[in-house]
Protein backbone atom coordinates (compact mmCIF):
# COMPACT_ATOMS: atom_id res chain seq x y z
CA UNK A 1 0.00 0.00 0.00
CA UNK A 2 1.09 3.55 -0.67
CA UNK A 3 0.41 6.01 2.14
CA UNK A 4 1.05 9.73 1.96
CA UNK A 5 1.60 11.58 5.21
CA UNK A 6 1.91 15.33 5.50
CA UNK A 7 4.86 16.07 7.76
CA UNK A 8 3.89 19.68 8.40
CA UNK A 9 0.57 21.38 7.81
CA UNK A 10 0.04 25.12 7.65
CA UNK A 11 -2.52 24.90 10.45
CA UNK A 12 -0.17 23.06 12.80
CA UNK A 13 2.72 25.38 11.99
CA UNK A 14 0.54 28.42 12.73
CA UNK A 15 -0.05 27.02 16.21
CA UNK A 16 3.66 26.21 16.66
CA UNK A 17 4.60 29.75 15.65
CA UNK A 18 1.94 31.18 17.97
CA UNK A 19 3.46 29.12 20.79
CA UNK A 20 6.90 30.56 19.99
CA UNK A 21 5.44 34.08 20.09
CA UNK A 22 3.91 33.29 23.49
CA UNK A 23 7.32 32.43 24.93
CA UNK A 24 8.66 35.68 23.48
CA UNK A 25 5.70 37.43 25.19
CA UNK A 26 4.61 38.74 21.79
CA UNK A 27 0.95 38.07 22.49
CA UNK A 28 -0.40 40.25 19.69
CA UNK A 29 1.41 38.19 17.04
CA UNK A 30 0.28 35.00 18.81
CA UNK A 31 -3.32 36.26 18.62
CA UNK A 32 -2.89 36.94 14.89
CA UNK A 33 -1.79 33.33 14.29
CA UNK A 34 -4.55 31.95 16.51
CA UNK A 35 -7.06 34.08 14.60
CA UNK A 36 -5.73 32.75 11.28
CA UNK A 37 -6.20 29.20 12.60
CA UNK A 38 -9.72 29.99 13.84
CA UNK A 39 -10.64 31.52 10.48
CA UNK A 40 -10.32 28.05 8.94
CA UNK A 41 -11.81 26.06 11.83
CA UNK A 42 -14.45 28.22 13.52
CA UNK A 43 -15.98 30.73 11.15
CA UNK A 44 -17.25 33.89 12.75
CA UNK A 45 -14.93 33.59 15.75
CA UNK A 46 -13.01 36.69 16.76
CA UNK A 47 -9.99 36.12 18.98
CA UNK A 48 -8.46 38.74 21.28
CA UNK A 49 -5.99 38.82 24.14
CA UNK A 50 -8.77 39.66 26.58
CA UNK A 51 -10.98 36.81 25.32
CA UNK A 52 -8.14 34.29 25.69
CA UNK A 53 -7.27 35.57 29.17
CA UNK A 54 -10.89 35.53 30.25
CA UNK A 55 -11.65 32.04 28.94
CA UNK A 56 -8.40 30.27 29.88
CA UNK A 57 -7.97 32.25 33.08
CA UNK A 58 -11.26 30.90 34.42
CA UNK A 59 -11.75 27.65 36.26
CA UNK A 60 -10.24 24.65 34.53
CA UNK A 61 -12.27 22.09 32.66
CA UNK A 62 -10.97 18.67 31.73
CA UNK A 63 -10.80 19.55 28.04
CA UNK A 64 -9.52 23.12 28.06
CA UNK A 65 -7.00 23.40 30.85
CA UNK A 66 -4.59 20.79 32.21
CA UNK A 67 -2.23 20.82 35.18
CA UNK A 68 1.13 21.44 33.56
CA UNK A 69 4.45 20.21 34.96
CA UNK A 70 7.05 21.34 32.42
CA UNK A 71 10.77 21.40 33.10
CA UNK A 72 10.82 25.04 32.06
CA UNK A 73 9.14 28.16 33.43
CA UNK A 74 5.70 29.32 32.37
CA UNK A 75 4.60 32.53 34.04
CA UNK A 76 1.20 32.47 35.73
CA UNK A 77 -1.37 34.76 34.23
CA UNK A 78 -1.34 35.76 30.59
CA UNK A 79 1.46 33.44 29.45
CA UNK A 80 -0.13 30.39 31.11
CA UNK A 81 -3.53 31.32 29.66
CA UNK A 82 -2.07 31.52 26.15
CA UNK A 83 -0.19 28.22 26.59
CA UNK A 84 -3.43 26.53 27.65
CA UNK A 85 -5.14 28.01 24.60
CA UNK A 86 -2.46 26.68 22.25
CA UNK A 87 -2.51 23.23 23.88
CA UNK A 88 -6.30 23.14 23.49
CA UNK A 89 -6.12 24.12 19.82
CA UNK A 90 -3.24 21.71 19.12
CA UNK A 91 -5.30 18.93 20.72
CA UNK A 92 -8.10 19.70 18.27
CA UNK A 93 -5.78 20.13 15.28
CA UNK A 94 -3.71 16.99 15.78
CA UNK A 95 -6.37 14.64 17.17
CA UNK A 96 -5.77 11.99 14.49
CA UNK A 97 -2.03 12.45 14.02
CA UNK A 98 -0.50 11.18 17.27
CA UNK A 99 1.18 14.51 17.98
CA UNK A 100 -0.57 15.02 21.32
CA UNK A 101 2.07 12.75 22.87
CA UNK A 102 4.76 15.38 22.32
CA UNK A 103 2.70 18.00 24.19
CA UNK A 104 1.99 15.49 26.98
CA UNK A 105 5.71 14.79 27.42
CA UNK A 106 6.92 18.37 26.98
CA UNK A 107 4.42 19.90 29.40
CA UNK A 108 4.29 17.01 31.90
CA UNK A 109 0.56 16.46 31.50
CA UNK A 110 -0.90 13.55 33.44
CA UNK A 111 -3.14 11.27 31.39
CA UNK A 112 -5.94 9.13 32.80
CA UNK A 113 -7.50 6.25 30.88
CA UNK A 114 -10.72 4.73 32.14
CA UNK A 115 -10.68 0.94 32.01
CA UNK A 116 -13.75 -1.27 32.08
CA UNK A 117 -14.85 -2.18 35.56
CA UNK A 118 -14.38 1.35 36.86
CA UNK A 119 -10.59 1.18 37.06
CA UNK A 120 -8.25 3.91 35.91
CA UNK A 121 -4.73 3.85 34.53
CA UNK A 122 -2.94 7.13 35.26
CA UNK A 123 0.26 8.07 33.45
CA UNK A 124 1.90 10.32 36.04
CA UNK A 125 4.54 12.94 35.32
CA UNK A 126 7.43 10.77 36.53
CA UNK A 127 6.12 7.48 35.06
CA UNK A 128 8.86 5.51 33.30
CA UNK A 129 6.38 4.59 30.54
CA UNK A 130 6.79 8.13 29.21
CA UNK A 131 10.23 7.24 27.83
CA UNK A 132 10.14 6.06 24.24
CA UNK A 133 11.77 2.66 24.08
CA UNK A 134 14.99 2.17 22.18
CA UNK A 135 14.49 0.04 19.03
CA UNK A 136 14.88 -3.72 19.55
CA UNK A 137 17.74 -4.01 17.06
CA UNK A 138 19.70 -1.42 19.05
CA UNK A 139 18.93 -3.23 22.31
CA UNK A 140 20.02 -6.46 20.59
CA UNK A 141 23.34 -4.80 19.76
CA UNK A 142 23.98 -4.30 23.46
CA UNK A 143 22.53 -0.90 24.40
CA UNK A 144 20.62 -0.92 27.69
CA UNK A 145 16.88 -0.37 27.16
CA UNK A 146 15.04 2.44 28.87
CA UNK A 147 13.66 1.24 32.23
CA UNK A 148 9.96 0.46 32.30
Which residues fall in each region the model found?
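Acidic/polar-rich alpha-helix caps and helix-coil junctions
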Residues: 1-148
Amino acid sequence: AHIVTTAFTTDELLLCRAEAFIYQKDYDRAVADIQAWCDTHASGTTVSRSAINQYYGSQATERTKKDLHPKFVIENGEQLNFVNCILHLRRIETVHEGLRWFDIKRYGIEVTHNISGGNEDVLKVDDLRRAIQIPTDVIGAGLTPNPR
